[in-house]
Swiss-Prot record:
Compositional bias (Polar residues): 1-18
Key words, A-Z: ATP-binding, DNA damage, DNA repair, DNA-binding, Nucleotide-binding, Nucleus
Segments of skewed composition (Low complexity): 21-40
This protein's name: DNA mismatch repair protein msh3
InterPro entries cross-referenced by the UniProt entry: DNA_mismatch_repair_MutS-lik_N, DNA_mismatch_repair_MutS/MSH, DNA_mismatch_repair_MutS_C, DNA_mismatch_repair_MutS_clamp, DNA_mismatch_repair_MutS_core, DNA_mismatch_repair_MutS_N, DNA_mismatch_repair_MutS_sf, MutS
Length: 1134
């Protein structure tokens, strides 16, 4: 109820001439008397009285007043009626749920509600429907305090009533036995549900068990959407019913009123008369909806689709309000908030999801066991940005290819078409079922069936979808759109099935329009980027660290110095997809170099300042405009930001005007002013202040308003003129010579005040609305009619304003491609500036690229570890090349904790950084372009595929041997440790030999098997494979022991080991495992036993080697020099 408090003096009604003139803002306030809550047992009290004929109420009031005047002379009746009137109104007011909301605007689900809305201006208030004309006849009668005689009389009547009843509170006790009073609380301070009123009233369905009209509505909608948690609009609250109420109470920490939880009328709940329920206030809907979606639920908003004034003017005035499911949201489709879901607040604290929905389908498996092959099709869409990724590939029994794509895309929701094979299903469950997985949060999984004719149906549905789009968008770009359509129709069968399923799926959420943007379809398998498989992403910590799966400590965290959300998303793509195109790569590096070298110049400062001023996510907002979900303040922010950017670079007409030497920078800057004229043309049509305040009635400037808006505003003005003219008519009936003055009390307008001494002149047809001890206030029948007509115009005006705004958004959407390209260039500039910031760090250098496959780094460092270490990182050199007479593989040995894994990760990360276009942490770097990096690091089993640690190890190794090529980098860490020493050494030696001889790729092989050093002797000295180790120093009894002498005595327990973290030539003959045990604080008695056993085992090994050498010597003496080489190798190993 809109208006001023009762204590405020009555305000004279404004004249019509002041209606269209600008006025100072006036803050509307709620009535001081909130409506009483209804009994929780009856969910449809509001609907049961919705259709009551208002004329009957007016007639009843008129007859009561006439009787009072006849019996009491016009004064006493006015004194006695208020208490009864107040009680009846208190019960009825909430029953009319349509009057609980002050305006139709309060039903909006825009994200602006979460930030608070500005108070509308007085002029806008004139257009807003407040329902005051309907409430006028039902308002409380305001009275002066009762005198002492009246109070005493009422006390006496109450005593007689109690005596007749038998004892105090007996009526309340009776009611409590039928319907227990339940209190509702909300930890957030929201409006509470009150206990049932202590008055026994007849409630529909309370005893008969019959469902009320609103309950039938809820059940009907719920049965059609059983997988959806429904939030139902009921008057001034949103409510949850049944099992949905219990779920919402748990997630939102609100109270659930007990009742029926099932929607199938199960006999076990036949004794219950009403549904369980929980409620939230209207203004908190966006907050709670976001929390439910973030918790993984699919929610639906059920709204009243008709308004009070138009309902009373329609044919269904006696029926309940019509309710429909208007919005459905899940994690991937929640775009009604510009900030989306803040996944950093997830319970797991994991990395933020990318917002992709990913659809998977696959064919039946071919082959058995390790020979199993399946064909998989995927399609992922990011509704917030419009990006679509698709792929079709064959996968082995380990499902490594699918895992790679899932880790790259990091979806927040999966749609599975048809049945999956057991291995695929287990992989999906493993990645989606844990809140501590690499995605940082649980993934919502939805499944749909797959018929035998799915392929044909999908092709037909996709073709029809795009044919309809082409028909609806006949334009000058039709040839281009036709070309894009042909691209979509050429997709493979599995991808087409996914696309069809995704179109159907997104239609439920009203987001199917994202597939119109076929320009942004990308193939995952396009070999224009380096391939980083799932193991590589995890082992090298590209997106998240391996400790707690957060971004801190990852490569992306190291590079992310972006200033915008859309720039951050683009950088994430760059990090996961390093370039293979040498020309594009050199252009990107040149742009970074120029930005770094000109860091404090005006042109670079202008770019930084422009990006700092972008405070909204333009890419998300543009998609929300395209979907028609953008709010007015958000639209104003987008248009003004784009205008500001265009004005900053208005002088740039061609790329050469940008003033940079880099082609990439000039092209990006030159695209920014291209949208200036388009944006200004839209800004010229809107009222900026009204848009900022989310004022729909004044959003458009007057000469740009639609005809419907103008007609309804004129209609409201005409009604105001009629009301003004009615002042003299009312005065004539009161026998006055001057026009009456309208007053507004408690939000009820156009009241005529009459002193109680003059009530004899008031016509019987006038309806008394409120009064005091000295004054009575009335509405004439004509005023009631005019107000009802005005309210109908106001609600129609509201609908017309929404329709005009929707059309306005559609007009902007026609320029989507141009605006999107501008935002993409702005994101590119943000990423380049981020890389330039990293390049400015101490010790970073510009990499140079060669046509050969090589990695030549001097003074290289680990990019993440050096930022996390409190001390300086020890640099190392690396030289690998596939060219003849060069080393292409390193066999790396060294003590435990000596830095072997950090070194090989450093080499891989430097290569990735270079191909992203970044500077690298080294003194100098000369690199060839790698087409893939493959890693096999760590030890873990795979319960979801029932594989042991060693099986996982060998399966991943087999996948690497099949996938790696001459331009790849392979990293193998301690291969063979999952089995016995002899088997492990044999497998490790065979794999190493294969990689070096057959694959001929760059390789870093870490091992603790010193015997593998002999493999290098199978190649020419100093070529192909070279033995290196991590340097260390050992001190025994204060005397330094060299690596060569380390194994002469086995007293390693008494040695002090110092790690140098430098790479040196040769083999580390010992691993110093007992030193690590001592650092781990293993008990001394255990260490003593281990040291003794270690010496014993090593002595036995030496004895066996000596015996073997003596046999070799005998063979050499008997058979000549044929086995002389083997003898030399054995002596060296000994």
């Amino acid at each position: 109820m809109m208006g001023k408090p009762n204590s405020t003096p009555a305000k004279t009604q404004k004249s019509i001439s002041s209606f269209f003139a600008p006025k100072s803002s006036q803050k509307p306030q709620d009535s001081s008397s909130p409506p009483a809550s209804k009994a929780p047992g009856n969910l449809d009290d509001a609907d049961s009285n919705e259709g009551t004929n208002e004329d009957a109420k007016i007639t009843g009031n008129r007859l009561k007043r006439v009787l009072e005047e006849d019996e009491n002379g016009g004064n006493t009746g006015a004194k006695e009626r208020p208490s009864k009137r107040a009680k009846s109104v208190e019960v009825e007011e909430e029953d009319n749920e349509s009057y609980a909301l002050p305006a139709a605007d309060s039903r909006k689900t825009s994200s602006s509600l979460t930030r608070g809305k500005s108070k509308p201006s007085l002029r806008t208030n004139k257009y807003m429907f407040s329902g005051s004309s309907q409430r006028a006849t039902e308002s409380l009668i305001e009275e002066e305090p009762e005198d002492e005689l009246e109070k005493a009389r009422k006390v006496e009547l109450h005593k007689k009533f109690v005596k007749k009843l038998g004892h105090p509170d007996s009526l309340r006790r009776i009611i409590h036995e039928d319907d227990a009073a339940l209190e509702v609380g909300d930890e957030e301070g929201e409006e509470d549900e009150e206990a049932p009123a202590p008055v026994k009233t007849k409630k529909k369905g309370a005893k008969t068990g019959k469902l009320t009209p609103m309950e039938l509505q809820v059940i009907d909608i719920k049965r059609k959407h059983m997988d959806t948690l429904l939030i139902v609009e009921v008057g001034y609250k949103f409510k949850f019913f049944g099992e949905d109420a219990r779920t919402a109470a748990k997630v939102l920490s609100i109270v659930c009123i007990p009742g029926k939880f099932r929607f199938d009328e199960h006999p076990s709940e036949s004794h219950l008369n009403y549904f369980a329920s929980a409620s939230i206030p209207v203004h908190r809907l966006p907050v709670h909806a976001k929390r439910l979606v973030a918790a993984g639920y699919k929610i639906g908003i059920v709204r009243q689709t008709e308004t009070a004034a138009l309902k009373k003017a329609g044919d269904n005035r006696n029926a309940p309000f019509v309710r429909k499911l208007t919005n459905v949201y899940t994690k991937g489709t929640y775009i009604d908030d510009i900030d989306g879901l803040d996944t950093t607040d997830a319970p797991s604290g994991g990395a933020p999801a990318t917002g992709y929905l990913l659809c998977i389908t696959e064919t039946k498996a071919k082959g058995w066991g390790t020979d199993e092959k399946v064909e998989v099709g995927i399609l992922a869409v990011q509704p917030a940005t419009g990006d679509v990724i698709y792929d079709n590939f064959e996968d082995g029994f380990m499902r490594g290819e699918l895992e790679t794509r899932l880790l790259h895309i990091a979806p927040c929701e999966l749609l599975i078409v048809g049945e999956l094979t057991k291995a695929t299903d287990k992989l999906v469950q493993h990645l989606s079922g844990s809140s501590t997985n690499v995605f940082g949060d649980r993934i919502r999984v939805e499944r749909v069936g797959k018929s035998k004719t799915m392929a044909a149906e999908s092709y037909s549905r996709v073709a029809q979808f795009y044919a309809d789009k082409l028909k609806a968008h006949q334009s000058s770009n039709n040839a281009r759109e036709q070309e894009l359509l042909e691209k979509v129709l050429k997709l493979t069968e599995p991808v087409t099935i996914c696309l069809s399923a995704m179109i159907t799926h997104m239609t439920e959420y009203g987001l199917e329009h994202v597939f119109d943007l076929t320009k942004y379809f990308q193939s995952f398998s396009a070999r224009s980027h380096m391939l980083l498989n799932g193991n590589t992403l995890t082992s090298l910590e590209i997106y998240t660290n391996q400790t707690d799966y957060t971004q801190k400590g990852s490569l992306f965290w190291t590079l992310d110095k972006t200033q915008t959300k859309f720039g951050q998303r683009l950088l994430r793509k760059w990090v996961g997809r390093p370039l293979l195109d040498k020309q594009r790569l050199e252009e990107r590096v040149a742009a970074v170099e120029e930005l770094k070298d000109n860091a404090n110049t005006p042109k670079v400062d202008k770019l930084n300042a422009t990006l700092r001023e972008v405070r909204s996510d333009l890419e998300r907002s543009l998609l929300r405009i395209y979907y028609g979900k953008c709010t007015r303040p958000e639209l104003l922010t987008v248009l003004q930001t784009m205008q500001r950017i265009a004005n900053e670079f208005a002088h740039v007409k061609t790329p050469s005007d940008a003033g940079f030497e880099s082609i990439a920078l000039n092209e990006a800057v030159a695209s920014l002013p291209a949208i200036g004229e388009i944006v200004i043309s839209f800004l010229d049509k809107i009222n900026a202040q009204a848009a900022r305040n989310d004022d729909k009635y004044a959003f458009f400037l007057e000469h740009y308003e639609t005809e419907a808006i103008g007609d309804h505003k004129c209609g409201i003005g005409a009604v105001e003129q009629d009301l003004e003219a009615h002042r003299m008519v009312a005065a004539t009936k009161l026998s006055k010579k001057t026009p009456v003055t309208y007053v507004t009390i408690a939000g009820i307008e156009y009241l005529i005040e009459v002193p109680n001494t003059d009530l004899k002149n008031v016509p019987a047809s006038w309806a008394k609305i409120s009064g005091t001890k000295k004054m009575s206030r009335f509405h004439t029948p004509e005023v009631i009619k005019f107000l009802r007509e005005r309210d109908q115009h106001k609600e129609s005006l509201s609908s017309a304003c929404d329709a005009a705004f929707s059309t306005f958004l559609s007009e902007i959407s026609t320029h989507y491609a141009l605006i999107r390209d501008t935002i993409s260039h702005l994101a590119t500039l943000d990423c380049l500036l981020s890389l330039a910031t990293v390049a400015s760090l101490p010790g970073y250098c510009k990499p140079t690229f060669t046509s050969s496959t090589e990695i030549s780094v001097i003074g290289g460092r680990h990019p993440m570890v050096e930022q996390l270490l409190p001390s300086a990182y020890i640099p190392n050199d690396t030289s690998l090349s596939t060219s003849p007479d060069h080393t292409r593989a390193l066999l790396l040995t060294g003590p435990n904790m000596g830095g072997k894994s950090s070194y090989v990760r450093q080499v891989a990360l430097i290569s990735i950084l270079a191909q992203i276009g970044s500077y690298v942490p080294a003194e100098s770097a000369r690199l060839g372009l790698l087409d893939g990096i493959y890693t096999r690091m760590g030890a873990y089993d795979s319960l979801f595929t029932a594989q042991s640690t060693f099986m996982v190890e060998l399966s991943e190794t087999a996948s690497i041997l099949k996938s790696a090529g001459p331009r790849s980098l392979v990293i193998l860490d301690e291969l063979g440790r999952g089995t016995s020493t002899h088997d492990g050494v044999a497998i490790a030696e065979a794999v190493l030999d294969w990689v070096v001889r057959e694959t001929k790729c760059l390789c870093l092989f870490i091992t603790h098997y010193q015997t593998l050093a002999s493999v290098a002797r199978g190649f020419e000295k100093g070529k192909e494979l070279r033995n290196v180790h991590m340097k260390f120093t050992a001190e025994r009894n204060g005397r330094r022991v060299s690596n060569a002498d380390a194994d002469k005595d086995n007293e390693d327990f008494d040695e002090e080991i110092t790690f140098l973290y430098e790479v040196g030539e040769g083999v580390a003959h010992r691993s110093y495992g007992l030193n690590v045990a001592r650092l781990a604080r293993v008990p001394k008695s255990v260490l003593d036993t281990a040291a003794s056993k270690s010496r014993e085992l090593e002595t036995q090994v030496k004895q066996k080697k000596l015996l073997g050498l003596s046999n070799m010597i005998s063979n050499v003496l008997e058979n000549g020099t044929d086995q002389l080489d083997q003898l030399i190798i054995g002596m060296e190993q000994l």
